[in-house]
Amino acid sequence: MRLSYISLTLAIIFVMAIVHAPETEAKAYPEADAVAEAIAVGEADAVGVADPGIKDALAKIWKILKAEVPTVAAAIENKVG
């Protein structure tokens, strides 16, 4: 019979934790809105495929890797072939 009290106790603790949780408030910065709008306008003008697929994504990652860390890219090229 005591095991039923454990679940009731845990449920009460869970409800109390939710009720007494601190409230959070999102703060909007006008600079962030301006940047997001500029990015959205720039992306709206771009023409391309919405989902380029894994091959194009890997090609972009490989290009960035070769530009940023050429020694690692060379090591990977030697191992892969």
UniProtKB/Swiss-Prot annotation:
GO terms for cellular component: extracellular region. It is found in: Secreted. Belongs to the formicidae venom precursor-01 superfamily. One of its GO terms (molecular function) is toxin activity. Pfam families: Pilosulin. It comes from Manica rubida. Induces paralysis after injection into blowflies (L.caesar), and then death within 24 hours. May have antimicrobial properties, like most ant linear peptides. The keyword tRNA processing does not apply. Keywords: Amidation, Antimicrobial, Secreted, Signal, Toxin. This is U10-myrmicitoxin-Mri1b. Residues 27-52 form a propeptide. GO terms for biological process: venom-mediated paralysis in another organism. InterPro entries: Pilosulin. Expressed by the venom gland. Residues 1-26 form the signal peptide. The modification Valine amide is found at residue 80. The keyword Secreted applies.
